[in-house]
């Protein structure tokens, strides 16, 4: 059977090769296609075999059935050449310059396979310089998938798209439709006004007549008054039309006196920094409308609003979230272990690393895996992830390790880098000025075999990726673990935890309300305002704190060492300038437990709203100041 299959394949190749030779030698030619006055001799049978359009043409009994020459209108000669080459050689030669014309020809000839290849090529090669052309091309021919994908890309990257020359060539009605939309991902309305003025100036003689209509769609009351004055000085055409002058004068009045009903904000203007309490258990958030057991709590400390995002534990994702980090480009990363179902299908247990898509898809996808360990820290610098220390199983023994592995997101590979100066587990890591700082944790002790096998660490270790080198910096006053850590105004805040004063020599440990603040420039620690009560992080190697707009927030935690204690559902705020803790929210719609607190810039439109019945029941969930 295998021999027959191979024989059929070779038979097909031989047939294709012979037909191609016949075309090149112009043997048995029975039709000539003409496009842009260029002639293409070929065979009706081949055309009809690949194209339903030509099959219908040659079998319908009309004039084309007997004509030797067939003129193709509105199709380029290059696209006909490319498609004929595909028919006769199975090679489709498309590139950025010809893909749209080839796609148009394939659409015209009803060649779905070729059109699909062109469509996928355009999706894969879409960027800010060409997405607008792809969008209007797709709309023109009715390619819904391509139109939807290019529209999403255009709207999401509009700030960058507006700086490219392609957008200056669109029609007035097309620009008008774009700038009417609330869904543009721009943070400042100034960029819309700038685009309108550049578009008009690109061909002022023909486009000035559209200025008033376009200007009405610019939300001028959202623009800085000084920017608007500069625009007037630089574009005298705004002063040559009475309607333009009226629009701008009304805008200045609106800027000075905020309206009762201000203009709608565009999508990008709503993006803000949120506290994300990632991970959850099956209890804690129940609603009569739906179960929120598969969602994670989010909180906007500025507006005091609650949102939810899908949890990485949902479905076939992670069974356990161990820790997480937000990268420099705002990518949200979590690491943990696979679900029991997936583990049963895997040969080995790994660290599973997932990332979140915050626009359009709203789901978690697997990024990579790493050699399994527990109680590790996860850090990031630029576009690299670092799995640091932890506890590994070596020859059936669990040992605390000092190894550090780096994952390059760009290159999709792992590399072992310089190890920690000591073995560590249950430690924390933060990034300041492109350097990693590893804080506290456990380290094994061998000197006193009759005592605890592990000692708490008060060390602060700094890693410089440019040197691949660790340095020990000034130690903390307390040796500790189960604390929270965050960076505020380039300083490291270490909050609460379990620990003891000085180096751990076996002295009594206690729950801490202590705040220690490290200044990297001066390499010194200072004492911060004590927390309202001793507080432990929810996980031994993850933080329950994050910084937003120069303020520090702690989202829940344990008030004691009892692991069965219910989470505190308060959010604490520390303003470094006031040097005082405030409770800014109580009874928040948080799960009974979560895994790691992260801070990322997200848009509320992409998030899940809170259940209305719980908002009604817990009317004070937004808290009090």
Curated annotation (Swiss-Prot):
<feature type="domain" description="BTB">
    <location>
        <begin position="29"/>
        <end position="96"/>
    </location>
</feature>
<feature type="repeat" description="Kelch 1">
    <location>
        <begin position="384"/>
        <end position="434"/>
    </location>
</feature>
<feature type="repeat" description="Kelch 3">
    <location>
        <begin position="492"/>
        <end position="545"/>
    </location>
</feature>
<dbReference type="InterPro" id="IPR011333">
    <property type="entry name" value="SKP1/BTB/POZ_sf"/>
</dbReference>
<dbReference type="InterPro" id="IPR017096">
    <property type="entry name" value="BTB-kelch_protein"/>
</dbReference>
<protein>
    <recommendedName>
        <fullName>Kelch repeat and BTB domain-containing protein 12</fullName>
    </recommendedName>
</protein>
<keyword id="KW-0677">Repeat</keyword>
<dbReference type="InterPro" id="IPR000210">
    <property type="entry name" value="BTB/POZ_dom"/>
</dbReference>
<dbReference type="Pfam" id="PF24681">
    <property type="entry name" value="Kelch_KLHDC2_KLHL20_DRC7"/>
</dbReference>
<feature type="repeat" description="Kelch 4">
    <location>
        <begin position="551"/>
        <end position="601"/>
    </location>
</feature>
<dbReference type="InterPro" id="IPR011705">
    <property type="entry name" value="BACK"/>
</dbReference>
<dbReference type="Pfam" id="PF00651">
    <property type="entry name" value="BTB"/>
</dbReference>
<dbReference type="InterPro" id="IPR006652">
    <property type="entry name" value="Kelch_1"/>
</dbReference>
<dbReference type="Pfam" id="PF07707">
    <property type="entry name" value="BACK"/>
</dbReference>
<feature type="domain" description="BACK">
    <location>
        <begin position="131"/>
        <end position="233"/>
    </location>
</feature>
<keyword id="KW-0880">Kelch repeat</keyword>
<feature type="repeat" description="Kelch 2">
    <location>
        <begin position="435"/>
        <end position="490"/>
    </location>
</feature>
<dbReference type="InterPro" id="IPR015915">
    <property type="entry name" value="Kelch-typ_b-propeller"/>
</dbReference>
């Amino acid at each position: 059977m295998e021999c027959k299959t191979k024989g059929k394949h070779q038979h097909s190749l031989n047939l294709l090769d012979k037909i191609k030779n016949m075309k090149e030698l112009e043997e048995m030619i029975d039709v000539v296609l003409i496009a842009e006055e260029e002639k293409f001799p070929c065979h009706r049978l081949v055309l009809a075999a690949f194209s339903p359009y030509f099959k219908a043409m040659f079998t319908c009994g009309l004039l084309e059935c007997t004509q030797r020459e067939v003129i193709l209108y509105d199709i380029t000669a290059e696209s006909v050449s490319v498609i004929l080459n595909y028919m006769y050689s199975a090679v489709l030669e498309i590139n950025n310059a010809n893909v749209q014309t080839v796609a148009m020809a394939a659409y015209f000839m009803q060649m779905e396979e070729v059109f699909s290849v062109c469509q996928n090529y355009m999706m894969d090669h879409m960027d800010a310089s060409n997405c607008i052309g792809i969008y209007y091309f797709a709309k023109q021919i009715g390619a819904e998938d391509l139109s939807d994908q290019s529209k999403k890309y255009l709207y999401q990257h509009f700030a960058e798209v507006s700086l490219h020359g392609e957008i200056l060539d669109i029609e007035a009605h097309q620009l008008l439709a774009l700038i009417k939309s609330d869904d543009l991902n721009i943070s400042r309305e100034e960029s819309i006004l700038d685009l309108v003025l550049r578009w008009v100036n690109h061909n002022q003689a023909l486009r000035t007549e559209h200025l008033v209509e376009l200007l009405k769609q610019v939300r001028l009351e959202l623009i800085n008054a000084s920017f608007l004055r500069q625009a007037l000085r630089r574009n005298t055409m705004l002063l040559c039309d009475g309607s333009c002058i009226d629009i701008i004068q009304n805008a200045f009045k609106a800027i000075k006196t905020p309206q009762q009903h201000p203009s709608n904000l565009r999508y990008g203007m709503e993006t803000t920094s949120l506290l994300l309490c990632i991970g959850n258990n099956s209890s804690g958030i129940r609603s009569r409308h739906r179960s929120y057991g598969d969602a994670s709590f989010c909180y906007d400390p500025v507006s005091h609003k609650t949102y939810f995002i899908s949890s990485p534990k949902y479905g076939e994702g992670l069974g356990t979230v161990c820790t997480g980090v937000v990268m420099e480009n705002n990518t949200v990363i979590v690491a943990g272990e696979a679900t029991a179902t997936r583990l049963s299908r895997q040969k080995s247990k790994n660290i599973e690393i997932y990332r979140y898509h915050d626009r359009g898809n709203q789901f978690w996808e697997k990024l990579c895996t790493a050699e399994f360990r527990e109680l590790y820290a996860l850090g990031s610098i630029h576009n690299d992830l670092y799995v640091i220390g932890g506890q590994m199983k070596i020859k059936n023994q669990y040992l605390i390790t000092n190894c550090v592995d780096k994952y390059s997101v760009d290159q999709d590979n792992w590399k072992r880098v310089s190890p920690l100066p000591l073995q560590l587990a249950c430690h924390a890591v933060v990034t300041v000025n492109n350097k990693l700082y590893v804080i506290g944790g456990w380290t094994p002790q061998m000197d006193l075999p009759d005592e605890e096998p592990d000692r708490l660490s008060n060390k602060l270790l700094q890693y410089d990726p440019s040197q691949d080198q660790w340095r020990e910096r000034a130690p903390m006053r307390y040796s500790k673990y189960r604390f929270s850590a965050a960076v505020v105004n380039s300083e490291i805040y270490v909050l609460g935890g379990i620990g003891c004063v000085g180096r751990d020599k076996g002295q009594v440990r206690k729950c801490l309300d202590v705040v220690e603040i490290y200044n990297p420039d001066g390499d010194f620690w200072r004492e911060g305002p004590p927390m309202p009560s001793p507080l432990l992080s929810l996980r031994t190697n993850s933080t329950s704190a994050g910084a937003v707009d120069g303020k520090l927030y702690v989202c829940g935690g344990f008030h004691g060492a009892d692991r069965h204690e219910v989470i505190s559902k308060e959010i604490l705020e520390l303003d470094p300038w006031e040097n005082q803790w405030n409770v800014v929210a109580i009874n928040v719609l948080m799960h009974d437990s979560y895994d790691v607190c992260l801070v990322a810039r997200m848009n509320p439109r992409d998030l899940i709203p809170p259940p209305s019945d719980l908002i009604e029941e817990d009317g004070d969930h937004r808290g009090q100041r």
